[in-house]
């Protein structure tokens, strides 16, 4: 459960390390796994294609807040993380770092699921 001004890790190799959540798209107050958000880069690797202060769309792939699955089980992660997207909706990076949630497959982010090292 992420809200405006939340700081989030970046789970891809785009060059950004940490972002600030500016807006949750879709008229919602909080962002959960699979939601699209607008972020500002707060910390980036020197020499990368992304620079501090740039705005990007992103999709949430991990949250500390536990989410309930249809079978009644719950899942939560150790950190809040997102993957940066381009203006066309494609992934900015080429690799996904860390585990991602299975719920992304239901929300049509199959490329993120296929590139992830671990799907929980």
Curated annotation (Swiss-Prot):
It comes from the Bacteria. Transmembrane segments: none annotated. Part of the 50S ribosomal subunit. Forms a cluster with proteins L3 and L19. In the 70S ribosome, L14 and L19 interact and together make contacts with the 16S rRNA in bridges B5 and B8. It comes from Karelsulcia muelleri (strain GWSS). PROSITE patterns: RIBOSOMAL_L14. Binds to 23S rRNA. Forms part of two intersubunit bridges in the 70S ribosome. InterPro entries: Ribosomal_uL14, Ribosomal_uL14_bac-type, Ribosomal_uL14_CS, Ribosomal_uL14_sf. Keywords: Ribonucleoprotein, Ribosomal protein, RNA-binding, rRNA-binding. This is Large ribosomal subunit protein uL14. GO terms for molecular function: large ribosomal subunit rRNA binding; structural constituent of ribosome.
């Amino acid at each position: 459960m992420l809200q405006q001004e939340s700081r989030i890790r970046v789970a891809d190799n785009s060059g950004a390390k940490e972002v600030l959540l500016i807006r949750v798209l879709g008229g919602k107050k909080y962002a959960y796994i699979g939601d699209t958000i607008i972020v500002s880069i707060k910390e980036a690797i020197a020499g990368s294609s992304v620079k501090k202060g740039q705005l990007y769309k992103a999709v949430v792939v991990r949250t500390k807040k536990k989410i309930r699955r249809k079978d009644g089980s719950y899942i939560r992660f150790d950190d809040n993380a997102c993957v940066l997207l381009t203006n066309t909706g494609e992934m900015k990076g080429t690799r996904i770092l860390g585990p991602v949630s299975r719920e992304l497959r239901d929300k049509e982010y199959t490329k993120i699921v296929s590139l992830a090292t671990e799907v929980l």
